[in-house]
């Protein structure tokens, strides 16, 4: 194999590996996001939204000092799909039951395929005009943990 063919071979494999594994690496360590409105704070962190996952999971916490947190997240949360036209409802919730001032749990969804460039989770609370929106760009190099190594 001559030098040019060796370089082509190497470049093809590097590009192929980046295409195959790049999105998984970026989706592995997405930041927690929070939203405060009406005295209720909602914090969401993706746990697993990788390309190989059949189920996507999000760690969700709700906190307030002023009201009862009776939200049924399986009925009020959804992911907006690629076309933005259909809402994907949760597959389940494992965590604290409705009620009280602090709730934590894992909200799960059937994974979207193919993996979108971004994920948008919305939670519509009773009495609030608009849903809370949490969005993560999966194809952004800013999500690569290697970019933030200290």
Model-derived regions: residue spans:
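Bacterial N-terminal signal peptides that target proteins for export
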Residues: 2-14
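Hydrophobic core
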Residues: 15-20
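N-terminal signal peptide c-region/cleavage motif recognized by signal peptidases
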Residues: 22-24
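Beta-rich carbohydrate-recognition modules and glycan-binding surfaces
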Residues: 26-29, 47-50, 94, 125, ...
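N-terminal secretory signal peptides
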Residues: 27-77, 147
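Long, contiguous binding/interaction regions
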Residues: 48, 52, 65-86, 122, ...
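Short, solvent-exposed, Trp/other aromatic-anchored flexible loops in extracytoplasmic proteins
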Residues: 84-135
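Short beta-strand elements
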Residues: 135-150
């Amino acid at each position: 194999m001559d030098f040019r063919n060796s370089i082509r071979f190497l470049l093809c494999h590097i590009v192929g590996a980046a295409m195959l594994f790049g999105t998984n690496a970026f989706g592995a360590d997405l930041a927690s996001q929070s939203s405060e409105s009406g005295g209720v704070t909602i914090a969401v962190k993706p746990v697993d939204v990788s390309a190989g996952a059949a189920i996507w999971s999000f760690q969700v916490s709700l906190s307030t000092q002023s009201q009862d947190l009776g939200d049924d997240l399986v009925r009020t949360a959804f992911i907006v799909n690629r076309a933005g036209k259909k809402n994907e409802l949760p597959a389940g919730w494992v965590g604290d039951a409705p009620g009280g001032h602090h709730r934590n749990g894992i909200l799960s969804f059937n994974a979207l395929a193919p993996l979108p460039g971004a994920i948008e989770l919305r939670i519509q609370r009773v009495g609030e005009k608009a849903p809370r929106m949490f969005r993560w760009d999966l194809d952004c190099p800013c999500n690569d943990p290697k970019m933030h190594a200290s």
